[in-house]
Amino acid sequence: MSTLHKFKAYFGMVPLEDYEDDYVDDRAPRASERGGARGPRPYSERAGYGADRYGEDRYSADRFGPERFGAERFGPDRFGADRFDEDADYPEPAYKSYKSGYPVARRDDYPEDAYGEDRYEAPRRPTRIDAAPSSGRFRAGGGAPMLRGATRGALAVDPEAEERRLEERMRPEPVVARRPGIFEDGGPLSKITTLRPRDYSEARIIGERFREGNPVIMDLVELSNADAKRLVDFAAGLAFALRGSFDKVATKVFLLSPADVDVSAEERRRIAETGFYNQK
């Protein structure tokens, strides 16, 4: 049978009996070789479906007889009473005797070392050192005076000395006002004087300081406009008479410079920025 015929026979397109002799047993002689047409074979003669396959020998009594499933295999001897005997000796577990009430905790169950009183020590207070009363500064033997509660050796500490040392460290250092370079010693304005007259009667003090050769800053902020104008006229005439200079530094603030002191515009600007005229 060709492959195409097998395919058609598989899907029922052609009868299977026409090609059964070639499909089932290739070793059997074909119908053309035997000299005639061959009819279909009985079902029992086909390969694999003979009487020997489903005969009595296959399901004989020897296979499923009482010898195989007899009482000896599944009888009471196998699952008898002697296997699960009630008199078997099993060890009985030991049980503690029951006592009514709550158990009292023993003191030994909670060791005292875990939360003892000496676990956290109280803060120690510094020992006060007091000098023992004595008539002299030193003892007769030339030794140091006796101290009450003093610690001797390398660990000796004087609390009073420590307090004085701490006070000196915390004491603020005096802040020295640093003047600009033009006001330092040796500078052109090192002898400068700032005057704040309250009225026109103090014009004499301004003239005396300027006549001594000292530069004078005249602050007229607190004066009225009338008195300030009179003092400005006085200072201008004074500077002209002594061949000095008269310059305005800020509003109502003027600088009188002697003849030997030359103040530049940069220095006047620095005087106004530093506010030196506000210092007494």
UniProtKB/Swiss-Prot annotation:
Q: What Gene Ontology terms describe where this protein resides (cellular component)? A: cytoplasm
Q: Which GO terms describe its biological process?
A: division septum assembly; FtsZ-dependent cytokinesis
State its location(s): Cytoplasm
Tell me which Gene3D superfamilies the record gives. Answer: SepF-like protein
- Keyword line: Cell cycle, Cell division, Cytoplasm, Septation
What Pfam families does the record tag this protein with?
SepF
Instruction: Please list where the region (Disordered) is annotated.
Output: 22-117
Q: Where is the composition biased (Basic and acidic residues)?
A: 25-36, 53-83
Q: How does it assemble?
A: Homodimer. Interacts with FtsZ.
**The family this protein is said to belong to:** Belongs to the SepF family.
User: Could you tell me what this protein does?
Assistant: Cell division protein that is part of the divisome complex and is recruited early to the Z-ring. Probably stimulates Z-ring formation, perhaps through the cross-linking of FtsZ protofilaments. Its function overlaps with FtsA.
What is the name listed in the Swiss-Prot or TrEMBL entry for this protein? Answer: Cell division protein SepF
What species is given as this protein's source?
Nocardia farcinica (strain IFM 10152)
Protein encoded by which gene: sepF
